Amino acid sequence: MTSTTMVTTLDLVTPTSEEQPGPAPESSDFSTVVLSPDGSELVTQSAPNTPIQHREQANAEFGQKEGSPDPKNMVAATGNASKPSLNSFYADGLGQLRNGLFSCFQPVFGYFGTKTTVEIEKSEDELWEIPFDAISELEWLGSGSQGAVFRGQLENRTVAVKKVNQLKETEIKHLRHLRHQNIIEFLGVCSKSPCYCIVMEYCSKGQLCTVLKSRNTITRELFAQWVKEIADGMHYLHQNKVIHRDLKSPNILISAEDSIKICDFGTSHMQKKMDSTMMSFCGTVSWMAPEMIKKQPCNEKVDVYSFGVVLWEMLTRETPYANIAQMAIIFGVGTNILSLPMPEEAPKGLVLLIKQCLSQKGRNRPSFSHIRQHWEIFKPELFEMTEEEWQLAWDSYREFAKCIQYPSTVTRDHGGPKSAFAMEEEIQRKRHEQLNHIKDIRNMYEMKLKRTNKMYDKLQGCFTELKLKESELAEWEKDLTEREQWHNQNSPKAVAAPRAQLRGYPNEGYDDMSSDEDVQPCRGSPYRCSNTSSSSGVQSSPFSRQSSSRSSAGQQTRRSEGANPPKILRNDAIRHSGSYWETLGGARGSPARDSGFSQDSGMWSAGAGSCTAINGGGQQVCYSQTLYRNGDGRWSDGRIASRRRVSTSVNKSTAVPGQPVFFTRDSPSRVPHGVISCSSPRSSSKLNRSSYPSRNAPHQLEDGCCCAHARAPRAKSIAVPMTSSSRARSPTPYDNDFENAESFVDPESPKNLKNLEKIVNLPESTSYDEALCNSDVTMNPIYTSPITTYSNPCHVELVDEENANDVDLTSSMDSRRSRSDDADVESSEEDEGNGNNILNTSMESEDLRYRIDTSQSTMMSSLERSLEIGATRSDGLSDNEMRVQAVKMSIKTHRRTGSNPQALIHQCIDEYTTSATDDSDDAGAVRI
């Protein structure tokens, strides 16, 4: 029967022979059988595949461009028939230009009011996501393998809500663009936990299977319409490359207008290739194609097989393969031993279409485009019957399906009806799904209730805070009003007085000055650098505390406390600009900071000898005198004898036998103030470093000479032997007679040359007591008088100064050096050349000029006294390193006040602390 039907439906087409001219027969679009080239056998061709979408669109566009030809006016094709048309060529070129080049200007369209593609997609995404809260009046309709279905209201529209179990089941964005009258419309999805659901169009009449079983009568027109609409909907899906894979009567809905709506695309597949692909095992086995059951490569023809099962179901109104176990269906359909029997009285065209769709091989199944064409051919056969005959025949088809007998080995419950246990399980499953959905809805509303309560608490707190602020604002306004009223009542009315007019002043901007003490005199002004307070036309002299306006020769009292003292900064350029004291620098001990000749500073009044030079304007220029730590009354009353070394032959030639030499802190060798020049080369030994005090490096003074405008190197220390003619008392500036001043000025005087010949090396002393024992008996062991000398810095001649008081000059400058530095000196080759003179330091110079200042302090604090004891009794080798380091840091960090000045060496000192294990004073380095 099957073979006969297949032969009758095929058209036999033979190739036209040249010897037998005649009209060529029309070829069919369906499966054909043609003769082989030799004519010996027939070749069967299967039905062509479903035309893909782009080919159909191309054919439609080509037909629109060229126009449909009239069969009556067709002519034979000429030789140029294969040549493409120029119109289509240019049209295709313009289309490519429009889609290629002009597509670059699409983002610019947004500036002119045209929506871009991104904006459109964004708005679609926002509309696609529907919050579950927006759906109201949910009503349970039923449940299936993928979830329960509810009916609800969304924006005054009845919608169907299908609740799914997983989030990935809501990913159907590839289906939202589907718009067809026979395809269910998807409105959006809910992808927020806990309710994942799909919102779609609602069909009031329900599923097709339900309608078929519930309605006793269905007209033949309605039956033919439903078949055509199902084919049209599936054809639209295949055109959009969508394979349903689960087409069955429960997934076909009936709308209120009795229109077919294909739904449930949960198992749909987006076809990306023309070739057959391996698909997963999904769908219901009763409607499943054999190739899908056997997991063979398949294509869109699997939906054609399912469509054939749906046609059989519509014809018989019975469930296919009823009461057969699923595994039996899978095995029977897969091995082609189980099939759906056809009623004998059914229309032949409908039966033929069903059998073609149920073919085992997918290539033998027609496409939906061919199905639509064939249905139009078979429909007249259906309308040959009357309505009554149709109803009787339709009922008979149902009875035929009920009487189908299957082997008892494959039926459930051995062919009997469903057992009560199976029915109870199905009811429990449905009830369980309903309860799960109710539970999810309850959880969702509980979460919403919590959010609502939280928002209410926040609003309540905001209202409370707002009321509190309102009360505070009202109280503040009330207080402000009361204060304004009180102010207006009690405040006196002020009347502005006219500005006082000063007469007799050429410039009204000048202020009246009562005395010279109320003025801030600038540096170099006549108020600071002259004997009188009147201004003069001569060049102003540099200001110092020894000048005529501040010393005993000038004003005798200091400025009152109310007057602001002039600020002296550390910057040398600001502190010493425009003065003769460029050689003195801005260090502590400069004339602007440490003069001792003011009446209340603890120093003696300066005599006429302190002003030995006369400037070009006729004014006396007074020079500063440095205040040393060894001054009378200072915090270091004694002198610390430095360690001695055995003099070498170089120094022995100049030393006086039997006369020990010492360096005291008030020695002129320590702080020479004269303008000097040193040509000694810098040593290349390891002692050539910036540690204080340096023994080999000829340090450069920071102070430049104002006359020569050059930097002078610092003078080196010179050891002077003590003589028996040294005085035991502390001299005063009045001891300086004119003769001594005269000898000071004359560098070639015999007396100065005699004193210079007494320069010898300091013998090594291991302690302070030994140094005192080696000194002269007539010498004061506690105090050595400072020697006051004077020199004009403008005098560029090299002058050897004389000890005006006939006192031997000693120094303990290097007494604080450690033995580690002494060991370094012994290993130095340069020290061997200098005779291992420990005092052959950077203060040695043959062009040395002395300027020594005397000072006496009037205040000594307890802290200074304790530091003095620690400094005098320490030789740098103390075992307690922490205590020594503490003493050093105390000395370095101690601040001196104006009443307790401190003289410093005229150089810029940058002190920093190294590790605590340093015994030497190199921890406080001196950088010049």
From Swiss-Prot:
Expression across tissues: Expressed in nerve ring, nerve cord, neurons, and pharynx.
SMART domains with a match to the protein in the record: S_TKc
PROSITE patterns: PROTEIN_KINASE_DOM (PS50011), PROTEIN_KINASE_ST (PS00108)
Reactions accelerated catalytically: L-seryl-[protein] + ATP = O-phospho-L-seryl-[protein] + ADP + H(+); L-threonyl-[protein] + ATP = O-phospho-L-threonyl-[protein] + ADP + H(+)
Annotated Low complexity bias: 530-557, 677-695
Modified residues (Phosphoserine): S874, S878
Annotated catalytic residues: D246
Effect on the protein of changing D246N: In u820; Suppresses microtubule disruption in touch receptor neurons caused by colchicine
KW Membrane (keyword) present: no
SDGLSD hexapeptide (motif): residue ranges: 874-879
Gene disruption: observed consequences: Overcome the lack of synaptogenesis caused by the loss of rpm-1 ubiquitin ligase activity. Defects in axonal microtubule development. Double knockout with dlk-1 also suppresses the eva-1 receptor expression defect in the madd-3 single knockout. Triple knockout with madd-3 and unc-54 results in paralysis (as in the unc-54 single knockout), and suppresses the lethality phenotype in the double madd-3 and unc-54 mutant.
GO CC term (a single one): cilium
Renumbered residue ranges of the record's region Leucine-zipper: 459-480
Biased composition (Basic and acidic residues): 53-69
Binding sites annotated in the UniProt record for ATP: L141, G142, S143, G144, S145, Q146, G147, A148, V149, K162
UniProt subcellular location: Synapse; Cytoplasm; Cell projection, Axon; Cell projection, Dendrite
Phenotype when changing S874A: Prevents phosphorylation. Enhances binding to isoform c
PTM (free text): Ubiquitinated by rpm-1. Negatively regulated by ubiquitination by fsn-1 bound rpm-1, followed by degradation.
Cofactor(s) for this UniProt protein: Mg(2+)
MF term (GO), any: metal ion binding
PANTHER family (UniProt xref): MITOGEN-ACTIVATED PROTEIN KINASE KINASE KINASE 13-LIKE ISOFORM X1, SERINE/THREONINE-PROTEIN KINASE TNNI3K-RELATED
Protein name (record): Mitogen-activated protein kinase kinase kinase dlk-1
